[in-house]
Regions:
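Oligomerization/assembly interface segments of phage tail-like spikes and tubes
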Residues: 218-223, 327-336
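Short pre-catalytic strand/loop immediately N-terminal to key active-site residues, enriched for Gly-Thr
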Residues: 125-136, 397-402
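Acidic-glycine-rich active-site phosphate/pyrophosphate-binding loop
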Residues: 112-124, 214-225, 389
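Fold-level recognition of mixed alpha/beta catalytic cores in primary-metabolism enzymes, strongest
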Residues: 134-293, 297-306
Length: 403
């Protein structure tokens, strides 16, 4: 199937004409520090939702609403999720409905000393706009709304397609109420196709469609070697501290090449697209002296193989350290799952690995914390083919399919 785009030139002109105004709107959204973590000012997430709702109304959506959903934490506490924006415009008879997804919450700014600009002041440098959330994912919101503005201007507001909007407010915080939200607002969000504007570019100037995503299985590891803290000068030597044992245990998660060594985790077939090692090194900033971990193509290591990262540890800082021999150590790992795997299988495999590799007779346990299914698009389906055709028409280039 090849789609004909009869209004391509007019749509392109409309997007170009409105680009600077769209950029200004993005700048205004970036100025709102919408961090959905409880340690931050959550009223800013409300501000962000209100700003997005106003933009949705301006774009011609009907029934624009800011909604939340309740969810239950692991300890049984019922909590309310962060505000999301949903909106809709009905489809004409016989026309499909498309759901547009992005998120308006952002990551914390982190260490301000590492910023060359103010995190929440969008700063333009050449063809780049720097600011927290400028790319992830407030640009995604504006991509959707700018496209609708171009369609409204070119075809008129009654262009027959049904369009729904779902702008989440807690994606960077792990989407704790996401499943509950989908169940609560299933009818409002039902659609024939979903367009997600929240992924990485393949390369500047090259159109790309993300056709697969790895899943996630996060969990906490605890290593215990004694009943209470003791003095390292009196007992160190015959007794290893829990942090040292944790380091030994974490090292078993990978083999000598750096490939994941946990049995039972799925690996998907090699992707067709090549990702040159030189490009990965340039994109990631990895030191020249550090070899790339794992085996297989770089693309497969990124998209179709599992990956495990240590993302947190409960350990005293150097500033607060003392001559204490720690008897318990905790770490959180994030495991990315290949398409075709599932979090339940991954948590089980990780728990078995941790138990089997407990060092020096220490007690080692794994507790599941977070789960997310991997995903693979049916690339031959009409929606995916239409998206690829649209990219060819807009860019004049063959789009690539990435993970």
């Amino acid at each position: 199937m090849t789609t004909e785009f009869t209004h391509h030139s007019a749509l392109s002109d409309a997007v170009t004409k409105n680009f600077e105004a769209t950029l200004q709107t993005l700048t205004e959204l970036v100025a709102i520090p919408s961090i959905a973590w409880e340690s931050h000012d959550l009223t800013q997430v409300d501000r962000s939702a209100e700003a997005v709702a106003a933009l949705a109304t301006k774009a011609g959506f009907n029934n624009v609403r800011i909604e939340r959903a309740t969810y239950t934490t692991a300890d049984g506490t019922e909590k309310q999720g962060m505000p999301a924006v949903i909106a809709s415009r009905p489809a004409a008879e016989g026309y499909p409905t498309i759901l547009l997804y992005a998120h308006h919450d952002v990551q914390p700014a982190g260490n301000l000393d590492l910023w060359d600009t103010e995190p929440f002041v969008a700063t333009r440098k050449g063809d780049r706009l720097y600011g927290r959330g400028a790319a992830d994912d407030k640009a995604g919101i504006l991509v959707h709304l700018a496209a609708l503005a171009a369609l409204n201007e070119t075809l008129g507001e009654d262009f027959k397609l049904g369009v729904k909007l779902f702008i989440e407010g807690e994606e960077e915080a792990g989407s704790p109420s996401f499943v509950s939200f989908l169940n609560t607002y299933r009818e409002e969000l039902s659609a024939d196709y979903i367009v997600v504007a929240d992924s990485a570019n393949w390369r500047a100037g090259v159109p790309a469609l993300t056709t697969s995503l790895r899943g996630v299985a996060s969990g906490d590891i605890e290593v215990r070697v004694g009943s209470h803290a003791i003095h390292s000068g009196m007992f160190g030597g015959p007794m290893l501290d829990a942090h040292t044992l944790m380091a030994q245990l974490l090292a078993t998660l990978h083999d000598a090449t750096g490939a994941v060594a946990v049995e039972g985790l799925h690996r998907a077939p090699e992707p067709e697209l090549e990702y040159a090692e030189a490009d990965f090194r340039n994109d990631s900033g990895i030191l020249d002296t550090v070899p790339l971990a794992g085996t297989g193509s770089v693309a497969s290591r990124l998209w179709t193989q599992p990956a495990i990262s240590v993302i947190g540890m409960d350990i005293p800082s150097i500033a607060t350290s003392s001559n204490t021999l720690a008897v318990v150590s905790r770490a959180r790992i994030s495991t990315r799952l290949a398409p075709g795997d599932n979090p339940e299988n991954a948590h089980r495999a990780l728990a078995e690995h941790i138990k089997a590799h407990a060092p020096h007779g220490a007690q080692a346990t794994y507790t599941a914390v977070d789960s997310g299914m991997p995903f693979a698009t049916e690339v031959d389906a009409d929606g995916a083919q239409t998206a690829l055709d649209a990219m060819r028409a807009a860019w004049g280039l063959e789009p690539v399919q990435t993970g």
